[in-house]
């Protein structure tokens, strides 16, 4: 052995057919930009018939309509924001707006009545079922307990009658709920829709009115702008639309005030009779109330005429 260490032998190259052999670039192989590769790409793309048959005029009209809608929505939103900030004036009818606010509050309170009545009806339904089950359980007990059979039978009959009365009151209450839902969800809501449409028409009118005012009476130091063709006529048309909708809303509110009171008062009388009969234990009067309601027709969707 010598003191020097021999260096490790250099690894030999793997055979050419080995999978570990390095890949050599063949100049004759096609490159990414070669003619062979490009020949695989189609020279032309066929346009589908659906795309080829598109009516460009119709598309342009829809785009123009969408453009007008976008501009109008932006102007209306800007008008509402400036009104809220107190930086622009708006058309005001204090009496009409006060009536609208009163109706909105009445509508909210009717909603509370409907929700509470539905909750009461749910409780009555559960109570009637519980009373019937208790009646049945006492009857089953009377079949086995001969010594207290009379007491069990009497209690069973009492609970059965109480359960039937609860079911009868629930039937009267459900008719009352149906009538109140008609007033709440249809009659008052129909009038509120007219009020909301009136408010939208008022905003559109104020947008054009303020645009005309800003163009004809610019701030000091600014030049007068030319109005678009037909701007004044368009503003007058929107004013007429607003006035018509406001008049329709006033008529509907007046008719609603006249008819709502009479309809709701009649329903309250029927409900009061049913409640008095139930809590006084007058089963015959309660049954009479149920029979009376069964002969009544369903309330009309609305007693406000369509305008």
Curated annotation (Swiss-Prot):
Pfam families on file: Arfaptin (PF06456)
CDD domains for the chain: BAR_Arfaptin (cd07660)
Biased composition (Polar residues): 23-40
Comp. bias regions, Pro residues: 8-17
SUPFAM superfamilies given in the database record: BAR/IMD domain-like (SSF103657)
InterPro entries: AH/BAR_dom_sf, AH_dom, Arfaptin_fam
UniProt name for this protein: Uncharacterized protein F54C8.7
GO molecular function, one term: protein domain specific binding
